[in-house]
């Protein structure tokens, strides 16, 4: 099982839109092994394209063994992140078949790859504002908690903490939400903000949107906090060397 398989409890083409979006988000950051028409020459690669009813598609897997297993033998390949491959295929006017015969099998046509490219183009806009913080909406927590936890887990070691809060004064529900990030070095903040903006672009839109804030102030008690601690393996209890000696 791979990271893509873990998200495919329901097959991609049977899943609802949020589940498909989460798989595509993970696909963008997955190192894919894509079949080539011939061995690469320097940095030039020629993707092996297969004719299908809807047009030509490239074939990629998330492990070398899966690609070799599909062909029944070793085949020329190149490794590249899904986001890079999606860009190449958009230029070539081709689709993408991922992990055929596996739990995470997906067939992405040109329209799906175009949507993926649009989501990956999401970028934060820097700004400042004075906000009144409040508890996040239950609906927003239900929609964002799990996928945000997965993405924030990728940032362990780069940030010290994260919390989701609501913002706004009027009404029973927050007008918007803020994802508070603590402990991020200033030089890393643009890259972290871009990664989180991409993640949010793949998730169901929330009323008023979700902003990303870098602050060292402790989140309020009503915030939804994300546990970024690294789990330590519990050492096994020492085994006795032998039965006790009875005297």
Q: Where are these predicted regions, by residue range?
A:
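An interfacial alpha-helical scaffold signature
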Residues: 1-247
């Amino acid at each position: 099982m791979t990271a893509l398989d873990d998200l495919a409890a329901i097959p991609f083409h049977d899943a609802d839109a949020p589940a498909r979006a989460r798989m595509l988000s993970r696909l963008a950051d997955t190192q894919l092994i894509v079949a080539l028409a011939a061995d690469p020459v320097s940095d030039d690669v020629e993707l092996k394209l297969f004719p299908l009813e809807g047009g030509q598609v490239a074939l990629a897997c998330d492990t070398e063994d899966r690609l070799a297993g599909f062909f029944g033998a070793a085949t020329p390949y190149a490794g590249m992140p899904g986001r890079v491959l999606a860009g190449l295929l958009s230029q070539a006017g081709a689709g993408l078949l991922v992990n055929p015969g596996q739990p995470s099998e997906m067939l992405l046509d040109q329209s799906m790859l175009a949507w993926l490219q649009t989501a990956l183009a999401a970028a934060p806009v820097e700004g400042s504002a004075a906000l009144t913080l409040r508890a996040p909406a239950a609906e927003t927590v239900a929609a964002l908690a799990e996928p945000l936890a997965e993405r924030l887990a990728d940032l362990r070691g780069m940030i010290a903490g994260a919390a989701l809060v609501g913002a706004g004064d009027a009404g029973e529900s927050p007008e918007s939400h803020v994802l508070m990030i603590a402990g991020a070095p200033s030089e890393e903040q643009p890259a972290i903000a871009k990664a989180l903006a991409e993640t949010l672009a793949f998730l169901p839109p929330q009323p008023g949107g979700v902003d990303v804030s870098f602050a060292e102030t402790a989140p309020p008690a009503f915030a939804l906090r994300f546990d970024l601690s690294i789990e330590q393996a519990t050492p096994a209890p020492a085994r006795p060397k032998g039965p006790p000696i009875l005297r």
